[in-house]
Structures are given as structure tokens and as C-alpha cells.
């Protein structure tokens, strides 16, 4: 039988019963500096919001969404032209060593004492799932915000606008790259 559940990019909350099936419970690799950006799309929202840094966090799992004690955390700078897939790949590479380090912390754990660092509830922010509608560019936003949206919403939902032409159906235009300046 397994001693530990390891979860990465899993869109569900595991119950206490599921976590109790292994002596050490479970750990979760999350693509943000928890407690910031709890939820399904942390990398997208970090770029969209113009954050200068993000990272990965490994938590000991509890039934609260991304709310368990922090075992490992690594911070990285978000490059100004980096897209979501590029940043996600970098974070994924960092995550491997963080998961291994967290597993070593649990190796001698007694299963009852608190392990890790409790998250600061006053610092919690959400990273909800994206919707297709969020990809529509709002032209009243700044050029920098539109650039961040295009970078953040790749590959889905993408960033798009509508071209209205006289006596024709509206044409949906998808933006794939932007440069401010």
C-alpha cells in the first residue's frame, strides 16, 4: 500500500477519508506562492495581474482548497514577456525538487504533530477557473494590462476581439503575441 499521496494540478478537493488512506496523508504541488492564488489557475492570474514574482509551493493536504501547511516554497521572477505556458514549464521543473524535499520532511513524521508552516489567512487570494468570456479584450484597459492578458490566457481561453464590418458578420480576431511600446 502507498504511504503518501502526491497530487499535482488536480482540480478536486480530496476528502478526509481519501487522505486517511495513506499513513502520511497527501502533499500537493501548487503553482503559486500560497496562500496567494488558491485555486485552479494560479499561473494565469499571476501574469494577468502583472505580478513580478511567483513560485511553487508544496503543502500537506487538508480538505480546504490549497489551504494546508506549507512544506516547501520556491520563488521565481516572472519575465516581462513570459507567457503562461513558458512560466508553467519553468515552475514544473522547480516543482520536482520541491516535492522530493517535502517527501523527505515527511519521512520521519509521526502523523500527529503539526508539520510545516500554517498559511496566513489574511494573505489568501483566489485564482478561479478561467472562462471563455474572460478572453475578450476590453479596450479601455491599459496597453500593459492587455499585454498581460494575452500572455496569461495562452493557450486557453486565448485573447480575442471582434472586428465589426458593415453589412457582414462580426469577425473574431485572436491575438497571440503583443509588445508594448
Question: What is each model feature region?
Answer:
Residues 121-181:
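Internal anion-binding site segments
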Residues 4-126:
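Donor/substrate-binding cores of folate-linked one-carbon enzymes
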Amino acid at each position: 500500500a502507498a504511504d503518501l499521496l502526491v497530487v499535482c494540478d488536480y482540480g478536486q478537493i480530496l476528502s478526509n477519508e481519501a487522505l486517511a488512506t495513506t499513513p502520511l496523508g497527501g502533499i500537493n504541488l501548487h503553482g503559486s506562492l500560497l496562500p496567494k492564488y488558491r485555486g485552479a489557475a494560479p499561473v494565469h492570474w499571476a501574469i494577468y495581474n502583472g505580478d513580478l514574482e511567483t513560485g511553487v509551493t508544496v503543502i500537506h493536504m487538508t480538505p480546504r482548497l490549497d489551504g494546508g501547511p506549507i512544506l516547501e516554497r520556491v520563488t521565481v521572477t516572472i519575465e516581462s514577456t513570459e507567457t503562461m505556458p513558458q512560466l508553467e514549464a519553468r515552475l514544473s521543473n522547480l516543482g520536482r525538487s520541491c516535492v522530493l524535499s517535502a517527501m523527505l520532511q515527511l519521512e520521519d513524521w509521526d502523523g500527529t504533530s503539526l508539520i510545516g508552516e500554517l498559511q496566513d489567512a489574511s494573505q489568501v487570494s483566489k485564482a478561479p477557473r478561467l472562462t471563455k468570456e474572460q478572453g475578450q479584450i476590453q479596450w479601455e484597459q491599459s496597453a500593459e494590462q492587455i499585454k498581460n492578458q494575452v500572455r496569461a490566457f495562452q493557450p486557453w481561453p486565448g485573447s480575442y476581439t471582434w472586428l465589426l464590418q458593415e453589412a457582414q458578420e462580426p469577425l473574431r480576431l485572436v491575438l497571440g503575441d503583443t509588445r508594448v511600446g
